Amino acid sequence: MDRPHTPILDQVNYPSDLRRMSNADLAQCADELRAEVISAVSETGGHLGSSLGVVELSVAIHAVFNTPYDKLVWDVGHQCYPHKVLTGRRDRIRTLRQKDGLSGFTKRSESEYDPFGAAHSSTSISAALGFAAAQDLGEATGDGIAVIGDGSISAGMAYEALNNAGDLGKRLFVILNDNEMSIAPPVGAMSKYLTDLSAKSPLATLKDIADGVASHLPEPIRQGAERARELVTGHQPSATLFEHLGFTYIGPVDGHDMEELLTTLRAAKARATGPVLIHAVTVKGKGYSPAELSDDCYHGVAKFDVATGQQKKSAPNAPSYTSVFGQTLLNMAEADSRIVGVTAAMPGGTGISTLQKAKPNRVFDVGIAEQHAVTFSAGMAAGGLKPFCAIYSSFLQRGYDQIVHDVALQSLPVRFMIDRAGLVGADGPTHAGAFDIGYLSALPNMTVMACADEAELVHMMATAAAHNDGPIALRYPRGEGTGVALPDQGDVLEIGKGRVIQDGHDVAILSFGAHLEEAKDAATALEARGLSVTVADARFAKPLDTTLIDDLMTKHSALITVEQGAVLGFGGLVLHHLAATGQLDGRCAVRTLHLPDRFIDQASPAEMYADAGLTADDIAQAALEAMGVEVLAARA
């Protein structure tokens, strides 16, 4: 496809080039940068809407602040595509989220302009404050700048950082990227006022800027600006939450007006002596009408046609695990009034939106607040409800103490629905669900399941609904199922019991979770070598089906465990049982296949599992090595 015409952007290799440009050229550069991002993401897919919303902010921040000496920290990081183009990575921008390409998030190892990596929310203020503390103690670092969205700033960690920043009183810049509030009326008047300001203006303090914005507006517009300020701060304009915390508050300002942004940032940089919060109002998907008109503002997109906005998604071969979860939850909720759903700002991503649309009073979206989601679910369980708490595996890590203290310790029957278990593809290591098997199985009272296919997901959800003897967790992967027929309703499984898929007598492959198909393929390869193979589906990591494991050990010469989780997960639990019962001293060789002890960069899931050594060929090779050359020779 034709690339956009970008004569001004072509002059930018690094942010220092922006600092030599006029304001008019910077505005033109932003327009060209937006076109470049749209063009690039149309070829790669990715987080388009959030990136389009911060184009002007990206240009203005890099033009005003001395990055990389000044430390720019993007919260979440999924809006960083314009930032990457401006910081020496334009030549690789069309490798976003691909194997050996650019990460879709900020990443310290990728560029000195990414001083702090991100992909989970609400960390930026803490990190930027850390840089400010390092500067005060003599380290060679400049100002700390955090760019955080209105969703991310709602999380508890962000408020902890704001509270600490206000208490320390260090020079710090927090830019609130507010893309949910429309304040169109005051934009023009504020722009005219702020354009008259400069870093050399006679204003004595930043408070003059903050207070002067509203005072220079006509009465109806001033009231609108004050309402916007009240909504974002939670207090009356005369006593904002941020000001109570020790911040100077400036805003709201138009996050797409280059003159206004430059004037505000330059004045703030020149005059700040303590923490400053700049409230910039932006539009998610700005400048690309298909994104602006979309319900999710093209938050995450596949490759698409720039002219039409039509996404190029391949037709699914089977329903996704997420959609099966959503429909099954609705079906069960219709039969049981005690079933409720809980999500932490991901109703669509988790599939819980299916229940939310049908029974909105039975779904609770708590925002980006996993800790609260877990304990809130615990409270509902204690109150007699059956909460299904649906959180991605990598995000559930954020609520681990609550799982331990508020759920497991009290043996409360919270049902944890853990989507995105295993490797997830283009989002890379930050979103991989690698650790939940180990960290959940370590807890007393916890039951841990993983489904081999979408039909098993339905059965395990029914099992979770019926389980009232403590918390229970069900992990399942991102993407399509295997295409098996779905039952009309799930069967309640016996807790701690697996199943044998096929019987053999030489090698046993014991799979936990969605790698069962690879286990079957490995069995086929081994059978072609003359080996008789048993394939079993563990179903449960906790409690283990020790009867099944003992039987496999007794009847086979090799046992191979397979899982989509980290070391010390399911395989570790099996080894612990075998060691405790003296079975590692016997005739059966044991090998555990799991994710390696390292983080795996983005690629397709198939490429990532190949990198991890978890293909069918890897499973077969592990079995052959466990059997030994002499055994194989005897069967040749």
UniProtKB/Swiss-Prot annotation:
Pathway(s): Metabolic intermediate biosynthesis; 1-deoxy-D-xylulose 5-phosphate biosynthesis; 1-deoxy-D-xylulose 5-phosphate from D-glyceraldehyde 3-phosphate and pyruvate: step 1/1
The protein's matches in PANTHER family, at most eight in alphabetical order, are given as: 1-D-DEOXYXYLULOSE 5-PHOSPHATE SYNTHASE-RELATED (PTHR43322), 1-DEOXY-D-XYLULOSE-5-PHOSPHATE SYNTHASE, CHLOROPLASTIC (PTHR43322:SF5)
What is the annotated role of this protein in its UniProt record?
Catalyzes the acyloin condensation reaction between C atoms 2 and 3 of pyruvate and glyceraldehyde 3-phosphate to yield 1-deoxy-D-xylulose-5-phosphate (DXP).
Tell me the enzyme class: transferase
For this entry, the protein name equals: 1-deoxy-D-xylulose-5-phosphate synthase 2
- Check the record and name the SUPFAM superfamilies matching this protein: Thiamin diphosphate-binding fold (THDP-binding), TK C-terminal domain-like
* Oligomeric form and interacting partners: Homodimer.
**What InterPro entries does its record include?**
Dxylulose-5-P_synthase, THDP-binding, Transketo_C/PFOR_II, Transketolase-like_Pyr-bd, Transketolase_BS, Transketolase_C, Transketolase_CS
Q: Could you tell me the keywords of this UniProt record?
A: Isoprene biosynthesis, Magnesium, Metal-binding, Thiamine biosynthesis, Thiamine pyrophosphate, Transferase
Molecular function (GO) terms listed? Answer: 1-deoxy-D-xylulose-5-phosphate synthase activity; magnesium ion binding; thiamine pyrophosphate binding
Enumerate the cofactors the protein uses. Mg(2+); thiamine diphosphate
HAMAP family, per the entry = DXP_synth (MF_00315)
GO BP terms: namely: 1-deoxy-D-xylulose 5-phosphate biosynthetic process; glyceraldehyde-3-phosphate metabolic process; terpenoid biosynthetic process; thiamine biosynthetic process
Q: What is its EC number?
A: 2.2.1.7
Binding, thiamine diphosphate: 78, 119-121, 151-152, 179, 288, 370
* The keyword Metal-binding is annotated on this UniProt entry: yes
Q: Which residues make up the binding site for Mg(2+)?
A: 150, 179
Offer one Pfam family short name for this entry: DXP_synthase_N
Q: Which species? A: Jannaschia sp. (strain CCS1)
Q: Which family does it belong to?
A: Belongs to the transketolase family. DXPS subfamily.
The organism's superkingdom is given as: Bacteria
PROSITE patterns annotated for this entry? TRANSKETOLASE_1 (PS00801), TRANSKETOLASE_2 (PS00802)
Q: How is the cofactor bound?
A: Binds 1 Mg(2+) ion per subunit. Binds 1 thiamine pyrophosphate per subunit.
Q: Which reaction does it catalyse?
A: D-glyceraldehyde 3-phosphate + pyruvate + H(+) = 1-deoxy-D-xylulose 5-phosphate + CO2
Ranges in coiled-coil conformation: none
